[in-house]
């Protein structure tokens, strides 16, 4: 079975830190976690995959295409959630959604409403009024509303209590099963 994501020999150096020869593949309809202590390079790996930081060498093949050569096309097929994001804290969810949906050619309003209802989110609330768990659920609703085939999640369970963390992991399993989606996430919690 062809990998949804194949990372080959990614290298990125910073003063006092280096990612060296990071390689792995993610099969369709699977969940893969990057687990390590703080500062181990999990977020840097995800950012290098997404070209948010430029790796010095290596390649990323996503959906059988070179990600760096087909970045815009590939990004239409993925959902990205970075933990600890408090973007637009004073904006209502409905406002954030109205802006976000403009970036996706395959945005599905019915799908979005399904997840808003499923996650019991109130679109009239401001982002800062949500708990950490509800923030992640909202960001997942956004990510899944354009039929993402791959979710890349950085520390999605960070700051969650054990019950909320387990609920979120259950949601991940449901998404992979029902949405035919793969998930790559980072965490320092095992």
Give a label for each model feature.
Residues 58-69, 73-74:
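Conserved ABC transporter NBD signature motif
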Residues 7-10, 17-27, 34-35, 58:
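Conserved beta-strand
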Residues 151-155:
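Catalytic Walker B motif of ABC-type/P-loop ATPase nucleotide-binding domains
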Residues 72, 76, 80-139:
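ABC-family P-loop ATPase nucleotide-binding domains
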Residues 157-158, 190:
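Short loop immediately C-terminal to the Walker-B catalytic DE motif
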Residues 36-41:
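Walker A (P-loop) phosphate-binding loop of ABC-type ATPase nucleotide-binding domains
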């Amino acid at each position: 079975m062809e990998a949804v994501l194949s990372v080959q020999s990614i290298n990125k150096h910073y003063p006092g830190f280096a990612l060296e020869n990071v390689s792995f593949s993610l099969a369709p309809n699977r969940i893969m976690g990057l687990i390590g202590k703080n500062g181990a390079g999990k977020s840097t790996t995800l950012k290098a995959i997404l070209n948010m930081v430029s790796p010095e060498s290596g390649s990323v093949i996503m959906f059988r295409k070179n990600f760096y050569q087909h970045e815009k096309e590939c990004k239409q097929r993925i959902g990205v959630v970075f933990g600890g994001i408090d973007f637009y804290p004073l904006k209502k969810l409905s406002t954030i959604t109205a802006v976000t949906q403009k970036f996706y050619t395959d945005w599905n309003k019915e799908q979005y409403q399904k997840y808003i209802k499923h996650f019991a989110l109130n679109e009239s609330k401001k982002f800062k009024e949500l708990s950490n768990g509800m923030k992640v659920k909202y960001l997942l609703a956004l990510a899944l509303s354009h039929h993402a085939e791959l979710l890349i999640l950085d520390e999605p369970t960070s700051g969650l209590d054990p019950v909320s963390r387990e609920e979120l992991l259950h949601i991940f399993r449901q998404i992979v099963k029902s949405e035919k989606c793969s998930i790559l996430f980072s965490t320092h919690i095992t």
